[in-house]
């Protein structure tokens, strides 16, 4: 059987299942025949065949086997074939071939004895075939005939398993599956052919279109020139025959987005329109022409129809590009765009995260947006506003000026301060205020146009925020790399002291003589005068303690300060602007002579104006960014553009009232009444807050803000100036010219505003004409309680008219301040009457001591005998200050302007020689420098002068400070006695009419003169200034 299998493989490897019975081996064993192939027999259909016959028949039947494979099999074969063998046709062919072969008849005669045995075996085989069912055919495996019956059961199990696995199909299903498979193959081949044909047609069509548009085959010159491999530029230039390019206005920054959008629109329109295509040839934009997109089309109407309804495109603003400008428009330029990849670093251009570093996590398919990984800036609702009506939290939109510092998201803080807006997705993912936070980072989408992708140089601090948690960033390596990069970009100037770090001159020091881009010339100390050249990376600047340096590169560029420490190439200095210690690489510093803590336009502790109502104090000055503390005490960082102006404190006239009612002004020293009792100098006063600078506090550059009612004044500039000693009072040259001592001036009111509790009338719009009372004053604002209704309003105190409690004529605030808060009183009589009606207009009230008059009346001491304002019916005859009026006297020149009707009437007194101040007239007796004493007794002719002798000059005669011949001593008695003597007859300047020790002494403050001689006429009413005539119009 093995030989049969091998020969069948040679015969075109055609498998004929079950053509050989399994009884061959049993026949060989029973007869013990020879091993030759001729002795072996095969039983098919009850007849014997040799293997040679089988070999011959196999070759002849190769075609029939192929026909059997291709021909479909019936599920029910013929009856004869079923009884004899599964394949009856092959057996019949084998029998015919065996009959024709007559050469083997001798062998058949030799084996006649075995016919009976073979018949028995054949019967058994037929019975076994009848019992067996038709087995499934295998399409994939070539299964040979089995000779052993013991393995039939195993075959059935194996075949059934193969059927289940799908390797073998049943015979009844084979025809349908084969037919369906052939149909599928045919359809697939047809589809592939159609696709290939369509693709070929499209390629030919596209080639023809390009040939029509850009082909130059019709140009003979072009073909001739291109044969040599050179094409002149004039053939590449556009002409009037080419398509027309139109420039269309669009929103700046949307150019690339609109090009992609219009291109998709063009494709969609082409699909919907079928064979009729839209005549749009190209759409492009140029980076150097912002706000413009370019469309290539033959007609303007096509463009209008194409861009109609597209947002951000201004279709009515189109411009035809001239032919001569097309080459410049289409000239290729090197693009400076950076390819964006996942993981690239970018910076945000706008919003609260402006200039913050971010990492690209995802990029959209249209390359217009990117999902960024950002370090969040959150305050967790600390600055939110609460609506008083609904009592609901209203999120305050953060701005760049008031943004919080960058920190990773803290779910614990969010849960404690703003639980309502926090949602937990998992242990790593949180949603807070509609934004996603994963592992503490914010993931947010931004448009590409709002990202800065060029020259991104992250700092070590920024990189540590992104990589320190995962440990995937080597900060030490990055720092070393940045140091090398900074060293390569170091700036050396002639005169800088440097140290050599590498090479043979390592450790040597010298001075830079010349600098270039890469090489520095240094003159080393201890070497020859010749300068040596060194690369920049091998040099380092040298600074000494106490040097004043300025940062010339890096994050703190522009800062200046005093060097405190130099170690390992790092310089630590205290900043003049922030008063903080900064450590900078030595190569990024430069020695400077300027130590002024000024940066840009604003300096440290400057008072700046943020808005019309808000001011702030600069506590840290930079070039473009400033750190301030506002009037509410909040510390914020603002840009230079956020500051409106600088307030000139020297010209500011602002004040406040402390807790003790004293006035506080700029420059005063105050101390807190409660709390830490901080003390400092007032920098500025703003509404209900004052800015104070303390020298003992380092926080916020020593500036803090408090309410003025919580402080008390320690020292005031005005108080110190007013309490200073006036040396001019003891100057004898000035004292000799001084007039009589004046009454004690009223102490100036300090602290309490003069407008407080005054009745006022409003002069500004809104409440004009209404009356009220001042309840509180704060700076320039006054709180008024209206009389008409129970309402308090705040208004400028200079827009009020102030009245007394009785009414009368109103005055302004400045007049009220000049009057020390006294308002004019009302009178029962006419307004020009100075005294009440119960005082007689001409009555004389002679008293020796001064009296305090009620109200604000002008008359002084003993002035009621003729010293009133002219009354009605007097025709101006009575002087408003004394006797007869100058303007209403009897004769021209006869009456004194300040005196009485007669020439000898005293200005300040009553009649004649009556002194204004009580005794003899100050200006009455003889000369103003030598007449009767202003302070002596009256009634004497040419009484003793206070400053001179009896009838002598004020610079002669009696000494003011001693007793000389010719007059009475001013300080002593009369008759050449000492001023301190107690002799009789001496008229004391400070005495009374009659002393206890001296008889006849008369006081300068004493009574009126008892004598009416011509010597005691008033200096203001006598005939001559040195005699008796009045200087203001006395008698001739």
UniProtKB/Swiss-Prot annotation:
SMART domains the UniProt entry points to: CTD, KOW, NGN
Ranges of compositional bias, category Gly residues: 892-902, 966-975, 1026-1036
Keyword hit for Iron: no
Compositionally biased region (Basic and acidic residues): 67-81, 179-189
GO terms of molecular function: mRNA binding; structural constituent of ribosome
Sequence segments annotated as region (Disordered): 1-189, 383-403, 892-919, 966-1036
Superkingdom, natural source: Eukaryota
Subunit note: Component of the SPT4-SPT5 complex. Interacts with RNA polymerase II.
Family of the protein in this entry: Belongs to the SPT5 family.
Protein name, entry field: Transcription elongation factor SPT5
Gene source species: Kluyveromyces lactis (strain ATCC 8585 / CBS 2359 / DSM 70799 / NBRC 1267 / NRRL Y-1140 / WM37)
Phylogenetic lineage: Eukaryota, Fungi, Dikarya, Ascomycota, Saccharomycotina
Gene: SPT5
